[in-house]
Amino acid sequence: MSWKRSERLMDTIKHYSNFPATSVSLRQMVQFGEKPSTGTLFRASQFLSEELPIRLAHRVQELHELPDGLNEMPSICRVRDWYAQSFDELTNLSRPNVSSEVKNRLLKPAKKTELTSKGSQNPSIKPGQYRSAPETGNGNGNGKEAKGAATARRYYAAADDGQEWPVELAAYNTKFAEVLEKIKRRHDSVVTTVAQGILEWKRKKQRMQIDHNIQAFLDRFYMSRIGIRMLIGQHIALTDQRQRSDPNYVGIICTKTNVRELAQEAIENARFVCEDHYGLFEAPKVQLVCNNDISFMYVPGHLSHMLFETLKNSLRAVVETRGQDKEDFPVTKVIVAEGQEDITIKITDEGGGIPRSAIPLVWTYMYTTVDQTPSLDPDFNKSDFKAPMAGFGYGLPISRLYARYFGGDLKLISMEGRDEWTSSEMIRSSQGRTQGNRSMRLKLSGQLGMEVSERRQVGDAEEMLMDKGAGAPWWRSVGMEEGM
């Protein structure tokens, strides 16, 4: 039986959209440890059963209220219904009946508690830049701010594990994780489906580019999606982790992410795609300069995505600038620098550079230098859909959101007229320029080798959004007190 949205459901979603999201910190996510107890995991499940519907409701409302007919595009309506259906499933999931004694145990703090660290503003993000509704001035744009309320709701809250927990709690944890897995699969193709919706709108309106309002919406929407999937993916992994665990992982967070290994893997993947796309015997070579022992706490999947997209961009520029029939291409360089607070990954290529006037367009969704945007086949909305090497104009904008999500940034420096360009991804901040036509810097945030409590925390989508005064965490949006 196919799912259908009802007017009553939409009224409920509208009600939920008035509540602000709660922020979740990276610190809270790793406090679960290798094998979280049934009680601790149950409390986290209860938090998400309340937090995720709020976040989903924000997205449904924003999709429903898109201007200029964009909300009427078939693909946009499809995505809106996915979010509404996921909201419906979460809010209708029945909770177990537990005795008052068990409830008291769940609310009783664990004997051993840890202090959580405070966050800091990401200098790459302007206050309110990713706010859901900038014009409201109310907190994150989704309701009134409730000062101090965040401390009452937390993703990580260790329960008293002095005794065995009822089997009903373990059964609920498993069921909740199954529902999250179903939702995650449903939303796998949201990025490509929204891209299709934008294409539909551009064709109908005969527009060549999207305007600032739609660009801002896409930034907010995709940043929020990163936050939602981060929470869902982490909780699924934590539930599964009780059966099999890796000492270097807490959920999907790797406490010892090896930068060199991920960079080498991204290089190999990007070169393979380049060879396949252009029919080359051998793609341009990539030189990696990185110490073997640089590691830090991060989500490997995020870093892999950023490195792959920027490398793919660089290799394509080199091949198309030099010509596909050239036997020897100039070497693209990947240099990893470790600082006290930042890790900077600089990718320098000789791909011809970009005119200064065109640099802002690089970060615009649906902007591409490919002559013709590839068409999506009828099955583009399936989870196994793979986008082509280039042509949608999503690679760099989405990669920058991933970098900014955890406090870093992705910057492009272009020197037109020379033969190099540098693309650097920054895992935190760094200064410096590259020689050459294009330079991308990926900055990744956090002091390396330190406890999470000593690392700068990053905020999650909804509350980067907040426009609070100095000293207030901008990342509160994810649903926790510290922001992730």
Where are the regions that the model predicts?
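ATP-lid-like helix-loop hinge signature
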Residues: L280, N313-E350, P374-F380, M415-G417, ...
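Conserved ATP-binding N-box helix of the HATPase_c
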Residues: N269-V273, V299-D328, G339, L396-Y405
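Short acidic-aromatic loop segments in the C-terminal HATPase_c
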Residues: W363-Y367
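Beta-strand cores of modular interaction/reader domains in eukaryotic scaffold and signaling proteins
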Residues: Q287, M297, K333-I335, K346, ...
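Signal-transmission coiled-coils
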Residues: W3, E7-Y278, E282-K285, P300
